[in-house]
Amino acid sequence: SVSGNTVTVKSVGAGSANITVKSASNTNYNEKTVTYSVTVKYQTFTENSGVGYYADTDENGTVDGIIFADFKNGGSGYWGVSSDPYTIPTKTGLEEYYVSKTNYNGPFGTKDVLSARGSGNARFNVMALSDYNNGTKYYFKDAKNIKSGEWSMPTINTWITFAGQLNIRKTNQYREYGLKDTYWSSSGEYIGLYNGFTYSYSPYEKFPVRLSRTF
């Protein structure tokens, strides 16, 4: 857009570009063209905690998951009716992150999306936004080896951490987040989001799978 002597160009993403401005000629002015080189950088993420932000884990523009643990801070807590404990370790030498999309409206509300750049240790734990294979239910013997790239089945502690950090309770309409009642963990234990309990392995039950990863 043009306003007086100011030309405004909307950014379409990070990177370098040349902007060419061409003014039209008239009786008092000859046509002139000027080219400017610009570099657009994404905003570096500087908040103390990334919990509750969305994650684009492979920088392809698709939002992949919700961040539920931040290894920069670590932490601990309890979740559920039986107050199952969880612990988040602390790590150093972490990757740098930037805001790749602002105000993304997803199943966990409206929040910015983070992506990683550079090298270092993964700072966050991320849960996928949807169930594996469209929510298909599996016996554990069929579910235990499910993986997808760097995504794998969460441990029971990871599930407890996820539910505790995002305050997922049986009374807070967890289904609004796109979550099912019950999920397998990698050990065969399973978590009941609908009632706040965790359970030992059962060979007779069928549950969906949701994957997690560090990022």
Give short role names for the model-derived ranges.
Residues 8-9, 150-152:
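A glycine-rich, coil/turn loop motif that links secondary-structure elements
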Residues 2-4, 31-33, 120-122, 147, ...:
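Short, solvent-exposed coil/turn segments
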Residues 21-23, 29, 127, 139, ...:
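Mature, Sec-exported extracytoplasmic domains of Gram-positive
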Residues 1-43:
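Extracytoplasmic soluble-region selector
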Residues 10, 27-29, 117-118, 175, ...:
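Sterically constrained small-residue positions within well-ordered secondary structures
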Residues 15, 130-132, 157-159:
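Histidine- and/or cysteine-centered catalytic micro-motif in compact active-site loops
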